[in-house]
């Protein structure tokens, strides 16, 4: 298990229906001209049947004040494949993204979802990735997604974004004793820094309220 960082705890505490605390990225792709009609179906199948194993933070869920490994990880809950209604314009795409992005992520599961969206005009498809800010910040999350992509349009090797090893996953591969020491050390540091973090955050909020009185 890994303790929640105080700032992550604040993000979770402040979240409400009208104020979601997740971030999202939308990637738009062109289907190759010579691709078969089953291109998207094959892509989705390859992702779902990938032998790569989900790694932290993508296989972690909230367990009290800790992140814990989800022993019953269900890929179908997180990875979704949909087709836009015709005519499949950017308008329909953004309507779908707006609806999905407004929904809070289920806290009983790892806090992310990924959508492959086909049926976009111009022979295109999209990937929409949503992840909670408490799990990973937006920039780091998008970097992990980009690592799973290839510059080679003919590349067949697929590593799903949730299987890409980032710095956090490497830290968690340390021996168990080292990880326990790391958790205790991290928890001690976080408890010591909590008052300062809360003070700095409150000052930022007050400044924003001063700039935006409404």
PLM feature spans:
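A general structural signal for short secondary-structure junctions and capping/turn motifs
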Residues: 17-19, 104-105
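Membrane-targeting and insertion segments and their boundary/processing signals
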Residues: 1, 10-17, 67
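Soluble acyl-CoA-dependent acyltransferase catalytic core bearing the H(X)4D motif
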Residues: 1-4, 26-36, 45-51, 57-214
